[in-house]
């Protein structure tokens, strides 16, 4: 009697069968949605459109308001909108462009002066996570641009005198 895997009673599974099964699983995981390479291409395309850091106005502050790496020491990310104290509005938004595997996200950070509402700067970045073959390993990821994020934005807006 032969099983659906092509083995008969008492025989062991041929290593070639493992290759076929793994290949079928790989093909099945790619069917029905974009691959991680396609999502990476979309991440790169979006980055080219509006990704990166844009500074519209810098603010000079006393040197004692910065740590040894030149980062503002008054930044408190857990305070959300008030993360920069009473004079500035900090906003951070995460948008899910794709929630299925592989996921695609857009991070947008901005800093406004409270007194006049002027946008001082913003950072936009995109990322992909997952899209790999199932397994015990951590999913891969890709993001761009390389230089972006909240801390980098703040070090470009707030400058030590």
Positions of predicted regions on the chain:
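Mature extracytoplasmic/lumenal regions of exported proteins
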Residues: 66-161
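Sec-dependent bacterial lipoprotein signal peptides
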Residues: 1-30
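Residue-identity detector for threonine
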Residues: 2-4, 8, 35, 58, ...
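Intrinsically disordered, low-complexity segments enriched in polar/charged residues with Gly/Pro
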Residues: 9, 33, 96-99
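A sequence-composition feature that detects small, non-aromatic residues
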Residues: 2-4, 26-31, 48, 63, ...
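N-terminal export/targeting and maturation segments
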Residues: 28-81
